[in-house]
């Protein structure tokens, strides 16, 4: 009798855990207007960044030629200050936007940087950090 109760209790706990750990519904990422998010040419590499909050919004894109960032003030085009993957950019007003990649992890098809930050300066001179998860990937050459 004790064994039947134990089996029943265990089954109930497993059922409850199964219901409590279902995967949350995925939120569709917001697109950065004008970004070629998945149109890498063969042999081309890109950096793709999503916010780390609950929305997981698509907020950063960079390739060898261009970069775009969805800042708190709206989307801005960026010019790389070094070779790809650049970590220093300037916007059209000449303000610096820094990409701090942090520790990278190898993944199939590229690298991921789960604790990256995008750093900008406010008008008052304060540094604003935007947590971002970055993926670096390259489309194989044909």
Tell where the protein language model's regions lie, with residue ranges.
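Bacterial N-terminal signal peptides that target proteins for export
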Residues: 1-9
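C-terminal motif of bacterial Sec signal peptides marking the signal peptidase cleavage site
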Residues: 16-18
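Cysteine-centric segments in proteins
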Residues: 21-142
């Amino acid at each position: 009798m004790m064994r039947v109760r134990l089996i029943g209790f265990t089954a109930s706990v497993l059922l409850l855990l199964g219901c409590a750990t279902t995967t949350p519904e995925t939120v569709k990422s917001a697109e950065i207007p004008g970004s070629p998010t998945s149109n890498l040419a063969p042999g081309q590499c890109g950096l793709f960044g999503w916010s780390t909050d609950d929305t997981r919004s698509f907020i950063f894109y960079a390739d060898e030629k261009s970069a775009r960032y969805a800042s708190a003030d709206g989307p801005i085009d960026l010019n790389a200050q070094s070779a790809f993957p650049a970590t220093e950019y300037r916007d059209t007003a000449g303000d610096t936007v820094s990409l701090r990649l942090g520790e990278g992890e190898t993944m199939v098809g590229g690298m991921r940087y789960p604790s990256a930050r995008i750093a900008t300066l406010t008008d008052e001179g304060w540094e604003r950090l935007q947590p971002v998860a970055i993926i670096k990937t390259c489309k194989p050459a044909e």
